[in-house]
Amino acid sequence: MTAFTLPRLGTIAAACALLLPGLAQSRPVTITTQLKNYNGDGAYLAVYLTNAQGAYAGTLWVAGSKAKYYKHLSAWSRLSAADNQRLLGVTGASVGAGRTLKVTADLADALLDAGYEIRIDAAVEDHRDSAPHARLPLTTPQAGQPVRGKQYIHSTRFDLP
């Protein structure tokens, strides 16, 4: 499980969560992403959050360990460029065609139903780039509901306990 905190939250609840961590409530959120059966090497994926204005809020996971390919995760790379801690403890192996990536992160309850969005960018070596490949509103009604992806992503969803 990846512990995840967001230093850029603008809500009063989030500020309280940062100032009074003993009172902060969080829950594990599991993001499941099924890749399409494409021809090619393993996919690099960036799973990250944006706020209600579409600004980068934090990285949940990056699949793929060769940093030279991160620039092909174009939206994530552009949005997260100023975050020098974006990769601390959140990287793993690339994901093969037709395979599934499951990421679990502890997210503050203040993020749920507050306009945040889970975004997933994907890139495959020697294939064309496009992003974002999937967007999930971080809302209670969206939990458990699959969303169709684009290009390399067949579908994705997030689940709450």
Segment roles from a protein language model:
Residues 24-26:
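Boundary at the C-terminal end of the N-terminal hydrophobic targeting segment
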Residues 1-13:
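Bacterial N-terminal signal peptides that target proteins for export
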Residues 41-45:
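Short coil-to-beta strand junction motifs in C2/discoidin
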Residues 107-109, 113-161:
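Glycine-rich, aromatic-bearing surface loops/beta-hairpins
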Residues 19-21:
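N-terminal signal peptide c-region/cleavage motif recognized by signal peptidases
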Residues 46-50, 119-121:
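Beta-strand signatures of extracellular beta-sandwich domains
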Residues 28-39:
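Short amphipathic, basic-aromatic surface patches that mediate peripheral association
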Residues 52-115:
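Structured domain cores in non-transmembrane regions
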